[in-house]
Amino acid sequence: MATQRKHLVKDFNPYITCYICKGYLIKPTTVTECLHTFCKTCIVQHFEDSNDCPRCGNQVHETNPLEMLRLDNTLEEIIFKLVPGLREQELQRELEFWKKNKPQENGQDDISKVDKSKADEEGDENQDDKDYHRSDPQIAICLDCLRNNGQSGDNVVKGLMKKFIRCSTRVTVGTIKKFLSLKLKLPSSYELDVLCNGEIMGKDHTMEFIYMTRWRLRGENLCCLNCSASQVCSQDGTLYQSYPMVLQYRPRIDFG
């Protein structure tokens, strides 16, 4: 009977180590464009100076590469099971970090589990943009319900009471869908299609991308003006003022 070969942890190192810091992947985060994975902290810091993947050199996103990152919780669990003591070491490092950085707010040197979770939430909030992207170029949007005579019963989607909104050009279709689900009080399992000019938009499409590539305005509706609160900024810095961009929504249609 052939003996089974035992694999050492180092045999898996090419798959569980970070290309940037050369250590084990902590909070593994994958770039959706090329599927390369890095530590969350490493790749976020890298994207502060570059829009390219540090491993293959491909451009991840023209303006905001952070939109193309996804946490890989499954890989994280695999790494913790492969490397003895790594989970405990990481939890200890995180605890020590909050002890050093949050003593004044907690009023004590020792952070309990409850205090630690609060500190984690506060840390996440501090990393968010304080002005909620209000300093970004803004775009006016009309969210119009696409009426369909085929809708019936629970499949009917109503129109919004206030269908005009103003948001950052970096907002994605996925965020718009969440906004609609919240406003229309739809169940979490309910899925919507968002369309522009009759074409279904992908969840990662930004409002800027849709405006520049799908929202086909006629010449008389588009004029270059001086800077004002209602203007939209294009990628080359040109400012435009126009009628709101119209996005339509409807219950998702399964073509399969």
Swiss-Prot record:
One of its GO terms (biological process) is positive regulation of transcription by RNA polymerase II. Component of a Polycomb group (PcG) multiprotein PRC1-like complex, a complex class required to maintain the transcriptionally repressive state of many genes, including Hox genes, throughout development. PcG PRC1 complex acts via chromatin remodeling and modification of histones; it mediates monoubiquitination of histone H2A 'Lys-119', rendering chromatin heritably changed in its expressibility. Within the PRC1-like complex, regulates RNF2 ubiquitin ligase activity. Selective knockout in hematopoietic stem cells has only minor effects on gene expression and hematopoiesis, probably due to functional compensation by Pcgf1. It is found in: Nucleus; Nucleus, Nucleoplasm. Keywords: Metal-binding, Nucleus, Repressor, Transcription, Transcription regulation, Zinc, Zinc-finger. SUPFAM superfamilies: RING/U-box. CDD domains: RAWUL_PCGF5 (cd17084), RING-HC_PCGF5 (cd16737). PROSITE patterns: ZF_RING_1 (PS00518), ZF_RING_2 (PS50089). The keyword Lyase does not apply. Detected in hematopoietic stem cells and multipotent progenitor cells. It comes from Mus musculus (Mouse). InterPro entries: PcG_RING_finger, RAWUL, Znf_RING, Znf_RING/FYVE/PHD, Znf_RING_CS. Gene3D superfamilies: Phosphatidylinositol 3-kinase Catalytic Subunit, Chain A, domain 1, Zinc/RING finger domain, C3HC4 (zinc finger). This is Polycomb group RING finger protein 5. A zinc finger (RING-type) spans 18-57. PANTHER family: POLYCOMB GROUP RING FINGER PROTEIN. The gene is Pcgf5. Residues 102-133 are annotated as: Disordered. Residues 110-120 have a biased composition (Basic and acidic residues).
